[in-house]
Design a protein with these regions (language model features):
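Long, low-complexity intrinsically disordered regions
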Residues: 77, 81, 101-110
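Short capping segments at the starts of secondary-structure elements
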Residues: 1, 85-88
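Helix-boundary capping/turn motifs
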Residues: 2-5, 64-70, 96-100
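Alpha-helix boundary/N-cap detector
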Residues: 19-22, 26, 64, 68, ...
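DNA-recognition alpha helix
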Residues: 89-103
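Positively charged, polyanion-binding regions of nucleic-acid-associated proteins
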Residues: 56-60, 64-86
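Eukaryotic partner-binding/assembly regions in large regulatory complexes
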Residues: 1-56
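Accessory, usually C-terminal, subdomains that scaffold auxiliary metal cofactors
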Residues: 108-169
Length: 169
């Protein structure tokens, strides 16, 4: 199926279960964008491998399509792991967003609520993908990524994303 047909089917069957058509369209577009950065090997693994592998591939696709999330993973998650500081604190998020607001006019224009919502979303993504152990203490849980996936990401030149997930190993 083409992307437009997939989107049409998703909206027709309301698979995302949002109340408004606009929200369903938005989610469909985001998902198609994320799927678009995956090659056939990763799509096959996403569909047929373990739920853990699927979630790791989802994190990879989010990093590939969301620069701010990638920078968070690289500058905060990875660094916390390397420094053996295994908890993501509110302060970590605040410092990260402060630095980003100094680097980007767009980010600088955001209101506090935007940062709050982004923090919530990042925590939920990391928790649901088992990258943190719980949503309160936020203890970092280093994922066990299969050597097949690791080798593939290295071979396609995406080791920077692998390093962000694994702490630079």
């Amino acid at each position: 199926l083409s992307k437009s047909k997939l989107k049409e089917k998703a909206l027709e069957k309301n698979i995302f279960q949002y109340k408004t058509e606009n929200r369903n369209k938005e989610i469909a577009s985001v998902i198609l964008k994320r799927l678009g950065v995956l090659d056939d090997f990763l799509i096959d693994k996403l569909i047929h491998d373990s739920i853990d592998t699927s979630k790791q591939i989802a994190i990879y696709s989010i990093m590939k399509t969301d620069r701010l999330f990638f920078e968070f993973m690289k500058e905060v998650y990875r660094e916390k792991y390397i420094m053996v500081d295994p908890f993501l604190s509110d302060k970590d998020f605040s410092i990260f967003f402060q630095h980003k607001s100094e680097q980007s006019e767009r980010v600088a224009k955001w209101v506090d609520y935007t940062y709050y919502k982004l923090k919530q979303v990042y925590i939920r993504i990391l928790f649901e993908a088992y990258f943190i152990k719980d949503q309160d203490k936020r203890e970092i849980n280093k994922p066990l990524i299969s050597s097949e996936i690791e080798d593939h990401l290295i071979n396609i030149g995406d080791e920077v994303y692998l390093e962000a997930m694994l702490g630079g190993e």
